[in-house]
Every structure is written in structure tokens, then in C-alpha cells.
Amino acid sequence: EAAITDKTKALVLNNPSNPTGMIYSKEELEALAEVCLRHDIYIIADEIYYRLCYDGRKFTSVAALGEEVKKHTIIINGVSKSYSMTGWRCGFAACGDKRIAKVMTNCLSHALGNIGAMNQAAMAEAMRGPQDSVEEMRKVFEERRNYLVERMNQIDGVSCLKPDGAFYVMMNLEKLIGRTLGGRVIHNADDFAMAFLEKGLVAVVSCCAFDAPNFVRWTYATSLETIKEGLDRLEKFLKEG
């Protein structure tokens, strides 16, 4: 709340989170919504990973907390993640305030235009049709997550927490700071990511841009075989130095 100024217009809320994979509880969302309502701040809710929740965690949309919150919320969503339709480039925004919805529509029609009719039909069918395949994919993601987290925490020098949702793991490399790996002195995640790419031939995302310089992001949105190979290369990379 201390960060709010007279210039603050909106809070961007990513839930489930990229890059951490954490999920906000209903109580946390209520606390955030209360602050936003008190200061007349809109909530831009990025809920693209809403179907990917694990360990029985239930997703709560901030817009579902009441009519007043709904009017102050702009939901950003799509089918790229939960429905594995990345190449279709389909997304949408929804707002309980019709005035904002009209402005968004006008802006979109003049600046970008619409996505293809075929893409729109595919998105509608994905969201309206049977959801069995979506649940099957979620279960597979959960299995991959469990393997990645367990295996990573067995490797000396690195660790991670188990994420609640999405398909990312934040690997803690704090113990590697100061070491020389792949011919580079590791000062932060940028150094590690580059060294691991050059020597281990594995691409991870530095979290320096997320204000987490001692972490890199892994994804488990790939096959279990690829995950195993990546972790094998991590072990080899750390042992060889």
C-alpha cells in the first residue's frame, strides 16, 4: 500500500504466477481487493494459467469476490496455456465495467483488428466442449512437476520450492554464487544461465528481470524425457565446474 501514489491506476495481478507458480489464496485476494477498492484502483488480472492448479488447490478469480470488485477488475485470459493452443494466438479481456469494455473494443478495432475467424471458432470449441483432455494434461503437468522438484532438490548446490500452479520452477542457485562454472564466475542468474547454455547446452531463464538474481526459471511444459535429460546435464555441469 505504501507504493500507491496519485498516479497509480491499476494493479497487475498474475495468478497463478509466472515465474514462481504460486497461487494466491482467497484471503490474500480479498486483502488485495480491499486495498484496491479503497484507493479506487483497477485490478488487471492475468489468469492465463487458471486451469493448471495442483495438489487439490482451487483457483479463485479475484472478479468472483463481489460485484464491486468485479467492476474494478479487467480479466486477461486465453487458451495458450491451459489448452496448449500456443500457436493459435487466442486471448481475450473481460471487464465488469461496460465503459471500459467499450474503450477496449474501440482501441482493439483501430489498433490491431481481430484474430482469424477459424481461430475464434477453435477457441470457443475448446472452452465450451468437454474438458476431459484439459484435466488429463493438468495431471501430466503435475507428474512432471513432482519429478522435477524431487530430482532438483537431490542435486548438490541447487534447490527449489514446489509450485502450486502454472508450469514453472524457480531454481535457487544462491550456493553457486562465486563459483566458476563453464569458464565463468557466477555473480548472478545471468551468468549461470549463459554458462549453462554454453557448456551444458540447456536454456533456462534468468530471474534477474524478476528481481530475483539468485534464481533461474525452469519449465516442465515439455516431455518427461526432456526434463530428465536437462537435469542429467545440470548434474554433469555442476560436477565438472
Describe the role of every protein-language-model region.
Residues 1-241:
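PLP-dependent class I/II
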